[in-house]
Amino acid sequence: MKKSLSLVLAFVLAMTMLVGIASAEEGKILNIWCWNTEFQSRFNDYYPEVKEIAEDKSTTTLNDGTIVKWTINPNENNNYQNKLDEALLAQESAAADEKIDIFLIEADYALKYVDSPFTLDVRADIGLTDEQLVGQYKYTQDIATADGVLKGVTWQATPGLFAYRRSIAKDVLGTDDPAEVQAALSDWDKFDAVAEQAAAKGYKMLSGYDDSFRTFSNNVSAPWVDGTTVKVDANIMKWVEQTKLYTEKGYNNKSSLWNDVWAADQGPDGKVFGFFYSTWGINFTLLGNSLADSNAPAEVGNGIFGDYAVCEGPQPYYWGGTWICAAAGTDNAETIKDVMAKLTCDKDIALAITTDTQDYTNNVEAMDELASSDYASAFLGGQNHIALFAKAAPNIDMSNAGPYDQGCNEGIQTAFKDYFDGVVDIDTAKKNFETIIMEKYPELTEVVWP
């Protein structure tokens, strides 16, 4: 009897071990969800394990045979989040090769996913160590932390600067030197004065209504929501006042972020003094918009490549950023660990990304090294803009970030566009914002204005 029981126990133990091994075995399909090709490009270009990329870029094959399947759903009208949410809710019942393994999130809605059961603990579940993570900028971890648990990591840090046209600065201020231009734009009163000077010369200071929004919204005194009350910060209303003034005086071109007018204003025929941009915007958007021929080499002689420079501007701010999250239910934890470690913790890879693309990477040591080097951006006329980013990045404060940021930020800009256009008065714009918020977030009960 004892012998039989021992055999049974041995069999059960063996089966348990086999099940454990099977469950720990890495899947051969790595499903990654994102909203554009930015991370896909970084992954394909800089993850050392990439072996082959499909011609249509729908898949990437790794050295161990793992096939990365890319699902890219554009952000427009909340499309990305809607489809992601639907897939995550079905994650438990999905076949192993259909489960999401990695998905990307943005700062404005990071807490929605970070503070949820759909994301894994980067340390406890994935296995990254404090030693690996210590070199990242603190704010990038603060954004992706809930109840002390880190749920996402990023390869980039996104402090903001003011990118201006050198040729226009020379015409308006008599200089294009970043230090001298910064002295002329170091607070909002000075910024407004230069806007008046620029208008007298036939230029617009900004392209449109939303350009300066992040600079104001990142310098608020409290989060958007307190309990169930939306509290509109006084600094948000300063943005409203400035934008209305600029519109009435012709200091902007009445464009909206991402529309065709806004993009054209950054190009060869543009007459706009400058644009508020964070790190990704300079290399991912502004550079592309500056070219006369997008199919020709990005170099001096193609459009206004080389005619931009950057300075700190009137207030420090950050804008955007993309975080890598491991999805609960993944069978690729070890692969995800390696992806996160290589793309967000490796100094040499961080240096390569920044040197090649001008993206500002999330490695303090690497960025400080470039900041003090002879690194020069040809796009920015030979300027070492990394030095300005390195100065700004450690000071980014995420203490006022919250789960309602995306809806409130987008809602206030949408509601007040009609006010800037002269279609409604300010009281109607306020009521329209209240309607947008109450419809989007039924749990919120009131909006308080300063």
Name these PLM-found stretches:
Residues 6, 19-111, 130, 351, ...:
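Conserved N-terminal structural module of periplasmic/extracytoplasmic solute-binding proteins
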Residues 10-16:
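Bacterial N-terminal signal peptides
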Residues 42, 166, 341-370:
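Periplasmic-binding protein-like
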Residues 48, 238-338:
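Extracytoplasmic/periplasmic substrate-binding proteins
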Residues 92, 103-161, 189-192, 298-312:
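Hinge/lid segment of periplasmic solute-binding proteins
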